[in-house]
Amino acid sequence: DIAPVTPGVAVDLSHIPTDVKIKGFSGEDATPALEGADVVLISAGVARKPGMDRSDLFNVNAGIVKNLVQQIAKTSPQACIGIITNPVNTTVAIAAEVLKKAGVYDKNKLFGVTTLDIIRSNTFVAELKGKSSSDVEVPVIGGHSGVTILPLLSQIAGVSFSEQEVADLTKRIQNAGTEVVEAKAGGGSATLSMGQAAARFGLSLVRAMQGEKGVVECAYVEGDG
């Protein structure tokens, strides 16, 4: 990250007892952080404030994603890339064009990370139906902005909904990000839940790359055809 506190955050994280070695890099040149990377998750960018939607972030965040993906294409072109930076629906497209221009685009290795919509859906459905969130898994397809977020509520095993419940849940899931932005009153957007969602997606990706079968995550990707 360009923030000067990045190495300090890495030191803080390194004190957590895990088998993972943690390093932090700061500055405009991401090369040291990208060398030999198999998975790269991009979360850099400005956050929403009250009254803004994700598309309002485009002018700033598009340039950030473009710059980082250019460095990935040069340093670790084989890496799987997860785009978290909003607006995901367009930053993924920008990343794809940068990779195509560099001649290293692989649609099977570029993902718009929409896992936050899934964990929100799991939470909201569990609350409504009095279930443990660990027993609920809601497939959410589409993008990560407004009406492009499509929770497949009919696909949840052992749960049924009235038409009104479907309408209300869908609306809440699609507007959950705004709920957080307004609750923070100008203090930013979702960070803690997004961190959990990013970790879930990244770990699932690694498990699948290591050969584990049956690992399924929804994401915003280029389809066939």
From Swiss-Prot:
The record's section on Pfam families has:
Ldh_1_C (PF02866), Ldh_1_N (PF00056)
- What keywords does the record list, in alphabetical order? NAD, Oxidoreductase, Tricarboxylic acid cycle
Which Gene Ontology molecular-function terms are recorded?
Answer: L-malate dehydrogenase (NAD+) activity
Under Enzyme Commission nomenclature, its number is 1.1.1.37
Report residues binding substrate. R48, R54, N86, R120
What does the record note on quaternary structure? Homodimer.
NCBIfam families under this entry? MDH_euk_gproteo (TIGR01772)
The molecule here is called Malate dehydrogenase
Q: Which gene encodes it?
A: mdh
